Amino acid sequence: MIILCHLGEEHAMSAGGVDQKLGNPLHLRLPLDCGVKVIGAHCASEGDNVDFDDKDLKKTSNFKLFLRLMDTPKYKDLLFGDISSMLLYTRIGEPLTTILDREDLHENLVFGSDYPVPCIGLISRTDKLYSYGYITNEERLLLNEIFECNPLLFDFVGKRCVKSPETGNKFPKSLFGINHKLFGLNSNNSNNVI
């Protein structure tokens, strides 16, 4: 069994209010401790939540709580992070750079789009990706053209283009295919089909 759940703050759904406490990554410990594989949407890259490990229950960024779980050895084969919405203007900076630079996490990342969110031009900001150094101006112009024709393709190509402004690291090509580790497949066998 694999559980896909939203982590971090939720902004797309506001009907009736959203309890942001439900996006706390530390809530995943129970299913993880039971051996269930979990995909955390957006790598919990927005908002803050209570740190249950802190005696004073201080608020900590959801992203840092998620990374703590990702760095827990017993969860290495169970916890995965989805990179959907990682190019939105609210995640540019520490979350995106960290995920690009932490190559040790790449085999535990899965591609996702969070469709239809990337199709909203106001939050898909190539100017910010460019100004932070994730893409070149030429890539920015090309991505803008792609967005006008196909916003979903824009999201895919954008994730293939971005590089860390600090190290130049990119998402590995393997991230855009089947995650063999997630599905327990032999990555050396090209006949693995889900």
Regions found by a protein language model. Name each.
Residues 31, 37-39, 46-194:
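H/E-rich (His + Asp/Glu) clusters that bind or coordinate divalent metals
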